[in-house]
Design a protein with these regions (language model features):
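Beta-strand-centric surfaces of beta-sandwich/beta-rich domains
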Residues: 1-28, 35-136
Length: 136
């Protein structure tokens, strides 16, 4: 399942100490991949971090954040969302005094991770194999 969110962060409104908070609500499963797209234009003014509950998960070092221009950051989180709330919080702030800036984040979640696959029994695919109906 893919979750895509576009976040516009207004200039002179949010800061590192008071960032914009955007929730990405998902379902139970494992986050297996994702990417963050910074279009050309922010020139390092648009900053972003990803939180899971109170913990920063991207970038993993809480002293760092993403602030890029015309770049795609590939994510390979590989962690499970097995307890509610099934969501991530995206923190963004814009240090530009003139322009709003936008980024796009996409996350791929495998809702079936850890569950045995549902496979039909052979007898449902081949009626002649059903009990008491085998013909030789």
């Amino acid at each position: 399942m893919d979750y895509v969110t576009t976040i516009n962060t207004e200039h002179s409104t949010y800061s590192a100490t008071d960032p914009k908070r955007t929730l990405i609500r998902m379902t139970r499963g494992r986050l297996v991949a994702g990417w963050i797209y910074f279009p050309s234009g922010p020139a390092g003014h648009l900053h972003m971090t990803v939180l899971r509950a109170a913990y920063q998960v991207a970038p993993i070092d809480p002293q760092q954040g993403y602030a890029l221009d015309d770049a795609v950051v590939t994510l390979a989180p590989g962690f499970d969302l097995h307890q509610p709330p099934y969501q991530l919080t995206i923190l963004t702030w814009n240090t530009s005094t003139l322009y709003d800036h936008t980024l796009t984040i996409s996350l791929t979640l495998d809702p079936f991770f850890g569950k045995p696959p549902k496979r039909p029994f052979l007898s449902s695919l081949f009626p002649s194999l059903r009990k008491n109906k085998v013909e030789l």
